[in-house]
Amino acid sequence: MNVKIEESWRKRLQEEFDKPYFEKLVAFVKSEYGHANVLPPGHQIFHVFNSCPFEKVKVVILGQAPYPNPGQYYGVCFSVPEGVAIPGSLANIFKEIHQDLGKPIPTSGNLDRWVAQGVFPMNSVLTVRAHETGSHRNMGWEIFTDAVIKKLSEERENLVFMLWGAYAKEKAALINSSRHLILTTVHPSPRSAEYGFFGCRHFSKANDFLRSRGIQEIDW
């Protein structure tokens, strides 16, 4: 199957695109876009892939499902477009960065600046019906994004994987911990951040690891 995605990713994921589950997933997603309000706009489904080539990835942040409110999600996990109110989880991420590294808290929730440096924030599920949280779960996206994680683990070295919350922590089984740094804690959601996300210092730990491997750190 021919999927419009950045070339370095296409070469590594073509095997997935040709599998029966992905063909079924594409048929489902096309049907959904045809009769429902689905997020993000179709051309933005692979935005984070198109913005961060495979060989440029340094830090992987795993999320679960897209924001379900129109105007929020554009293909980058936790991020929102310029001018959109910063969601609670992202506000807590910024708060932890401020406490960890002393960085000022941004007024914009757009994380494209991170992506340009090699941060790869990816949801496990890449589409959602508007106002219906998790409505596209168990349709095949999880199989695909698990394959992405495995590819990164197998073909790259010295990556940082940030796994926040019980769901993301399960993905540690897909990652070779002898080749990469795996950082886990609770989700930054306002419901859970105070139980371990605040004070986790994942952002300084990531930079310390990258520096120790001779890799340019992230300007969070």
Question: What are the roles of these predicted feature ranges?
Answer:
Residues 1-13:
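Generic N-terminal amphipathic, Lys/Arg-enriched alpha-helix
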Residues 3, 15-163, 167-170, 175-176, ...:
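A polyanion-binding, active-site-adjacent surface
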Residues 199:
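Short, conserved glycine- and acidic-residue-centered signature motifs
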